[in-house]
Amino acid sequence: MKHWSIDYSIKYIDGTVKEEQATLEAENITIALGMALGNIRKPMLQDPEISDVVIWGVGIVEDEVFDE
C-alpha cells in the first residue's frame, strides 16, 4: 500500500473557499481517487453550509516514490 496526498478545495455558500489536504492509503492512484470522492467529497456535500468540493490534486507521497 502507498500513501496518497489528496488536495481539494471547499466552497462555502457565502463564497469563501478553503483549501485542504488529506492523506489516504491505497494500492494505486485510481483507488485513492475513488476513496477521496467517497470519503471526502460526498460527505462534505451533505453539509448545508458547503456549496461545492473540488478535488484538484492526487499524488503519491514523495517519500514513497521509490522502495528502499
Regions found by a protein language model. Name each.
Residues 1-17:
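Short aromatic-glycine-(Arg/Gly/Cys) micro-motifs in beta-strand/loop hairpins
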Residues 4-6, 20-22, 56:
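Hydrophobic residues positioned within well-ordered beta-strands of beta-sheet architectures
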Residues 16-31:
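A short, exposed loop/beta-hairpin motif centered on an aromatic-Gly-Thr core
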Residues 27-48:
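A short, charged, amphipathic alpha-helix used as a generic interaction element across diverse proteins
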Residues 42-68:
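Short, mixed-charge low-complexity intrinsically disordered segments
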